[in-house]
Amino acid sequence: MQEKHIAEIADYIAKHRQKLRLILIAGPSSSGKTSFAQRLRVQLQVMGLRPFSISLDNYFVNREDTPKTPAGAYDYECLEALDVDLFNKDMFALLKGESVVLPRYNFKTGEREWEGQTPLTLEKSQPIIVEGIHGLNEKLTAAIPREYKFKIYVSALTQLNIDAHNRIPTTDARLIRRLVRDYQFRGASALKTLKQWPDVRQGEEKYIFPYQEEADVMFNSAMIYELSALRRYAVPMLEAVTPDVPEYTKARRLLDFCQYFLDLPDEEDVPNNSILREFIGKSVFFKGEDQV
C-alpha cells in the first residue's frame, strides 16, 4: 500500500511538473520522512523527472546568531535558527532558472560556507525536494507562490488496537522507533532518549502539528509488522532503565506494550528500501554516518 501511495503522489507531481516545482516534506520525529523523501525521489526519477534534494540544515544561521532556549541551549528547531530570507532568495532564483551557489553548513565551525561549492542551475520543470520540520509553514517559503509548492505531511498512524477499547498510541510507536534508531546509530541509551522526548514533543506541538492542515497530501508510514521488528531491540534497552530514575515508569509502560507482540522471525524479510530500515539499519538509502 505504501509503495502504491508513493507512486500516486509521484504521478500527481509528474502530471503537474510545470507548476509543482518545490516539494516540501514535514512530519514529527521518527515519522520516517527522510526515507519517504528518498523513495519519492526514486519514484520521480522513474517517471522521467530529475529531482534535486536540498537540506535545510545548510541554511542554519551561524551558531553565534542561533536563538537559545530558556535553559541556554542552542535552539536549532525554531524557524529563526534558519536564514529564511536567504533560503527564499535561493529557491526563487533556482525556480527562475538562475545559477545559484548553495551554502553548506559546517557543524564543526558553526558557520555557513560557500567556498568550493559548485553553482547549481535547474532545468525547467526540474523539482526541488526539501525535507524538514518547518516544511509546512508558509513562512519558510513566503517568497514562492503557493501554486508552485506541493506539501506532504508524513506521520506514523498506528493501524492496530490492543483490544476493542484500547488503541496503540501513535506517539508511543514513534518513541519506540526513535529509541531503536538513537541506540543503533547514535549510541544513545534508552534513558537518554526518554529524557529528551518531552522536549521533542514540545517542539512538535509548536512547529509541526499546527501546520498539518497546510499539507496537500498525508502519507502514513506505519507498518502492521513494525513493532514485531522493533521489539527485539527495544525490550533489552527498556529493561536497562533502573527504578531510581523518573523515566522508569514510562520505560515499564513501553515494555508492557511490547509484550503484546512477537519478534519478527527473520529481519531479512524487511525490504532494504523499507521506511523501517531507517530505524533498524541496512537501508539502501543510507550509508554509515549518513543515517545518523
Predicted segment positions?
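Extreme N-terminal, non-catalytic leader segments
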Residues: 1-24, 52
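Conserved nucleotide-sensing/catalytic segment adjacent to the nucleotide-binding pocket
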Residues: 52-54, 61-110, 127
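Post-Walker A helix-loop "phosphate-sensing" segment adjacent to the P-loop in P-loop NTPases
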Residues: 42-52
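Glycine-rich phosphate-binding loop used to anchor ATP phosphates in small-molecule kinases
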Residues: 88-147, 194-211
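Conserved lysine of the Walker
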Residues: 33
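Walker A (P-loop) phosphate-binding loop of P-loop NTPases
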Residues: 30
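Conserved NTP phosphate-binding and transfer environment spanning the P-loop NTPase/kinase superfamily
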Residues: 3, 17, 138-292
